[in-house]
């Protein structure tokens, strides 16, 4: 499709709705970049047009921040995203603080950390539960939406699927049905590689005002797979033991969730090693016996998650995602009782996964495209209004379907009395957004056998210093303490539901890093929230990295815990470079370390240096880069 064709669509749209375009765009994958860029470019050229973009998670391939990063990233990005990936022009302009005066961008969820310090983005951030986004879009007067869709031909005519993004679109259409005075023009563009997804995502040709049936020439944005380190594995293992057989699973994105999925697969297929990991008692291990387990899954799990991602694919392939649900209360009750065989022809037809949006690796997208006609209906996409809450008229059915639910998310910090910080900093700078986290925490409390689990690393590194992520207090709160439930770190499990403040403090101190336990304990004592005589139990006084390494050693040996258990988008050499460059970045905060590295250097790692274009350094700067890189590569 030519630029002229896109320009014609812009002309026709402006003639219909005028020069004030309030443009709603889907979160993440479903944005038709070239079409969006055509509207953005027109507004840049014509200042009489006002373009207000309302969206979330605007994805662009990363831009290198230094020369060394560029040497590593540029070849990888060209290979991974293609040479001509159509970047979102508005997102680049926003990041560069160069938006024209007649264009605004309002988002309810940022790519993590991408907008810290960006005043324009921070000022226009909207804090909204995922389930409230459609309402808020309508309140802002959205009069135009653009979205990628999938298409298939049937005997009765073409069918369309909202595919990766029925999440807000379906709720928005329902919102407009209740507001007949508001008009919104809905345009869709067919993407030939977008998987055709089943469920409520399937719509007919009249759902949109116009369908553009031409290739957008836009590779699906595939997330590069991230490494999992020792702490990620341990957090994931601890959380995996809280998942009950015949239960329901919701997970988010990130290396902690990847560690959780890996833990569930080990529980299923390497159960002896899995049990060995828990041979030394963890803080909070009694909760495993009460609500989870160490046995392999028999009935399996059902996925009900706002985000459908690679992890669910791996769980399906591992024979864990196999518990069926049915959209009929009587059938679902039979299924929960293990009596679905009493209904001939029903077993094997239920859904295994209900999601609201998907985003993942290129392998994940290919797997979705290749689902056979028996499998495809078992992986359904629906509105976030249905996935992220119980109410809406089918509460009893959804409660039956979501039995023994474990809603597992990540956070950045936890206060000692149980409040969690997941999306922002103390000066109200937003790191990401609340998304659906509050929805799932609230839903866990609304269900008799549901639990909310928040995972976090006990510490973080910043500017060469280690800081505790379990704190006495923090000014920014995402989940208030009255909704406290379960917190998991690499050192153990803290069960906070229904506990007193003192009991919460005691539980969280036991899963904190030992470097910070005493100072935190003293703060709680000084505040009158902890008895002065209470001491950290002996078994929780050795919460150090060495303890974690020993625990993994007992569960199959160190080689059983690779950096990329589900595969990598990087070559073997690039995987070593990722570690080395990370080590160099951390060293940048210490001039002494950098000087020592430059002097010591390391052996000549020809393959890695060639990949970075530093095998034959010419300039003084290149020779310095080569020495620093050889130093960082020594242990990788």
Range-by-range predicted roles:
Residues 1-636:
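Conserved alpha/beta enzyme-core scaffold
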């Amino acid at each position: 499709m030519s630029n002229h064709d896109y320009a014609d669509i812009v002309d026709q749209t402006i003639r219909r709705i005028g020069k004030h375009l309030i443009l709603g765009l889907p979160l993440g994958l479903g944005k038709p970049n070239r079409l969006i860029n055509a509207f953005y470019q027109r507004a840049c050229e014509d200042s009489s047009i006002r373009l207000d973009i309302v969206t979330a998670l605007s994805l662009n391939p990363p831009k290198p921040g230094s020369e060394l990063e560029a040497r590593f990233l540029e070849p990888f990005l060209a290979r991974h995203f293609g040479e001509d990936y159509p970047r979102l022009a508005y997102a680049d302009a926003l990041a560069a603080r160069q938006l024209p005066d007649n264009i605004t961008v309002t988002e309810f969820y940022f790519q993590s950390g991408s907008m810290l310090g960006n005043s324009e983005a921070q000022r226009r951030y909207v804090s909204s539960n995922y389930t409230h986004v459609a309402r808020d879009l309508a309140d802002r007067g959205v009069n135009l939406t653009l979205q990628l869709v999938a298409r298939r031909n049937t005997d009765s005519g073409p069918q369309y699927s909202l595919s990766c993004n029925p999440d807000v679109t379906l709720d928005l259409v329902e919102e407009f049905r209740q507001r007949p005075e508001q008009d919104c023009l809905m345009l869709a563009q067919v993407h030939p590689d977008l998987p055709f997804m089943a469920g409520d995502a399937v719509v007919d040709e009249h759902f949109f005002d116009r369908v553009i049936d031409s290739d957008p020439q836009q590779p699906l944005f595939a997330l590069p797979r991230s490494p999992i380190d020792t702490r990620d594995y341990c957090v994931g293992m601890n959380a995996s033991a809280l998942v009950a057989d015949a239960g329901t699973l919701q997970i988010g994105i990130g290396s902690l969730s990847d560690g959780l999925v890996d833990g569930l697969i080990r529980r299923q297929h390497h159960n002896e090693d899995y049990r060995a990991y828990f041979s030394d008692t963890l803080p909070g291990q009694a909760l495993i016996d009460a609500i989870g387990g160490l046995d392999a899954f028999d009935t399996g799990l059902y996925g009900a998650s706002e985000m459908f991602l690679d992890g669910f694919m791996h769980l399906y392939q591992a024979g864990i995602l196999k518990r069926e649900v049915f959209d009929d209360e009587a059938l679902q009750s039979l299924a929960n009782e293990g009596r679905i065989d009493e209904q001939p022809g029903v077993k094997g037809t239920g859904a295994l996964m209900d999601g609201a949006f998907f985003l993942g690796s290129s392998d994940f997208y290919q797997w979705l495209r290749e689902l056979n006609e028996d499998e495809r209906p078992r992986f359904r996409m629906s509105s976030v209004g249905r996935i992220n809450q119980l109410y809406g008229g089918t509460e009893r059915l959804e409660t039956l379907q979501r039995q023994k639910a474990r809603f597992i998310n990540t956070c950045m910090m936890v206060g000692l009395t149980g409040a969690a910080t997941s999306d922002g900093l103390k000066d109200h700078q937003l790191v990401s957004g609340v998304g659906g986290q509050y929805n799932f925490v609230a839903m866990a409390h609304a269900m008799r056998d549901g639990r909310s689990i928040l995972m976090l690393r006990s510490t973080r590194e910043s500017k060469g210093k280690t800081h505790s992520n379990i704190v006495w207090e923090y000014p920014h709160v995402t989940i208030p303490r009255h909704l406290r439930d379960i917190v998991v770190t690499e050192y153990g499990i803290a069960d906070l539901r229904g506990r007193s403040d003192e009991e919460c403090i005691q539980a969280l101190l036991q899963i904190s890093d030992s470097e910070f336990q005493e100072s935190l304990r003293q703060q709680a004592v000084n505040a009158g929230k902890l008895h002065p005589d209470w001491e950290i139990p002996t078994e929780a006084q050795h919460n150090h990295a060495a303890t974690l390494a020993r625990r993994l050693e007992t569960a199959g040996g160190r080689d059983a815990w690779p950096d990329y258990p589900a595969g990598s988008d990087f070559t073997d050499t690039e995987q070593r470079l990722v570690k080395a460059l990370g080590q160099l970045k951390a060293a940048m905060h210490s001039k002494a370390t950098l000087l020592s590295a430059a002097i010591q250097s390391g052996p000549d790692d020809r393959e890695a240096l060639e990949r970075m274009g530093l095998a034959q350094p010419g300039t003084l700067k290149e020779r310095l880069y080569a020495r620093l890189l050889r130093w960082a590569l020594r242990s990788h």
